Amino acid sequence: MTKKWTALLLAAVLAVGLSACDTSRAEAPGSNLESGVSAIEDAMTKRNETESSSFPAGSDLRIGTSADTVATPDDFPAAYNYGTGKIEDYSRTAMLQKMPEPVDNATVLNTSADPNHIQALYLWEEGNVPAKTQFTAAMTGYFDNWDFRPYVTAIPVRTGVQPKGAVVLMAGGAYQFRGNYTDSLPTAAALRELGFQTFIVDYRLSPYTQEEGALDVARAVRFVRQNADAYGIDPDDIAVMGFSAGGIQAGEFLMHYDEDVNGTALDESYVPDALDAVPAHASAAGMIYSFYGRLSVGNMDPDWLAEGDLPPTFYVYGTEDPFYRQFRQQYDVIRNMGISTGRIVLNGWPHGFGPDGGWVNDYAAWLESVFANKEES
């Protein structure tokens, strides 16, 4: 079986039912997890009707390679072993694997940042998590249990490496699961080897809403900014990036929940704490087979996009992705709005390739340039 068709059958689950699992159905039964996975596995075997042969000449379109894909680093604990990071080695088991949770109620407020070790911290204090969705013990079958608390996992650069900035990552999964071991974790490892401090957000999924997840992203960005000195970075050198639904989640944060917006925007009972005084500001965005908008639908309205005062944005997608045309169209809209952009298009690649394809180094170089010239952006 070729790499492309292996990807179509397996890696596609990262998109998880972008058309089958709309987040507007917050009250849908938890069985949507399995039905969504199955639906997307079936849907992703269908070829996309692309016009890749007539793609404009330039350096954006490429064949794609696994030459630079990073396998699990030798200093990662066993619990963070994701394998080779290559699309051909993906499996449903890996895609549904969960990241280790924090221990001893360690939170971003009660625990000091550790720039020398992988560290998992809850994003919110117990009993003070802003929410508008009632998720109860009687609601079963979801990826997360009803008492799930969002958390961030910091993956710092190797000792002795001068950090170039920070990247906050969100996995895909159409709000039905988080594919950390197939996209965000191996990508974080690759960016870490290139000198970036990385932070993976385990944000809230269904039955929670996109808006609630955006607050989790904002909280993680605040944590990174507050601890910029500890991580050896400029507090303004922070990017957010996401894969599929994770990119949509990053976009929701940038459009409506960044800067000074806190949990009270959704939940009047939320009590702001010291971390809320830190602006949730990101200087760049990465849309990896994703777009600004909602599940399945990228927003192409320049007036709406302008409301978000969006930062420079980098797009990565394949020509065999069912959402190829939407990615391409939004990239053109964003660029025509005067927003600084970057792009890699992998010819013949599907949805859900994670860090594979040879795009991470280009993204890292683009990010360095954005950080160096952010005053002009």
Model segments located where?
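Short beta-strand/loop motif that positions the catalytic acidic residue
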Residues: 315-317
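N-terminal cap/lid segment of alpha/beta-hydrolase-fold proteins
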Residues: 58, 64, 70-161
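C-terminal catalytic histidine-bearing segment of alpha/beta-hydrolase fold enzymes
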Residues: 328-331, 335-377
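C-terminal motif of bacterial Sec signal peptides marking the signal peptidase cleavage site
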Residues: 17-20
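Catalytic nucleophile-loop/oxyanion-hole region of alpha/beta-hydrolase
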Residues: 179-181, 201-232, 353-358
